[in-house]
């Protein structure tokens, strides 16, 4: 079986503004681009060898992956199932809002207009299972 390294995208505009951005596209800040470059540098310096970088269709993930790819020489491709959880009506609202915190307590419940944590987990587990079956001993970031 291969290996998976998980990397989070760099800082986004909505991270700075303390907004929930889940499946909504929020671009990287300049600091986020620097974080992506630092991650790419760390991957190279650590000697991590990967066959492919997979990223979500959101620009913050795509830009992070492409910066890492440029620095490491590892090819990258978009994988739609890696899109972040859809928080539905909570997208663009404050992360620390009382109503959102209350809604998060219902782990298995779907956010109105979005998806539940369980739905997200199922989507990701299906992808990981598929990659393990298709790729044998490949390593992914």
Where are these regions (language model features)?
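A broad detector of the eukaryotic-type serine/threonine protein kinase catalytic domain
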Residues: 25, 108, 129-132
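Active-site-adjacent alpha-helix immediately C-terminal to a catalytic or transition-state-stabilizing loop
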Residues: 4, 62-63, 70-73, 126-141
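Active-site-proximal alpha-helix that buttresses catalytic centers in soluble enzyme cores
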Residues: 2, 7, 11-74, 78, ...
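Generic structural signal for well-ordered alpha-helical scaffold segments
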Residues: 37-44, 121, 125-133
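Phosphate-handling substructures
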Residues: 70-126
């Amino acid at each position: 079986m291969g290996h998976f390294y998980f990397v989070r995208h760099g800082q986004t505009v909505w991270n700075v503004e303390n907004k929930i951005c889940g499946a909504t596209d929020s671009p990287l800040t300049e600091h986020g681009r620097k974080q992506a470059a630092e991650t790419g540098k760390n991957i190279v310096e650590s000697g991590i060898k990967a066959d492919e970088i997979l990223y979500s269709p959101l620009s913050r993930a795509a830009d992070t992956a492409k910066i890492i790819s440029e620095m490491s020489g590892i090819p990258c491709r978009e994988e739609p199932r890696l899109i972040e959880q859809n928080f539905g009506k909570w997208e663009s609202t404050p992360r620390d809002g009382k109503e959102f915190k209350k809604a998060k307590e219902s782990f298995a419940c779907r956010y109105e207009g979005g998806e539940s944590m369980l739905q997200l987990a199922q989507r990701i587990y299906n992808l990981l299972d598929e990659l393990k079956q298709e790729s044998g001993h490949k390593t992914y970031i």
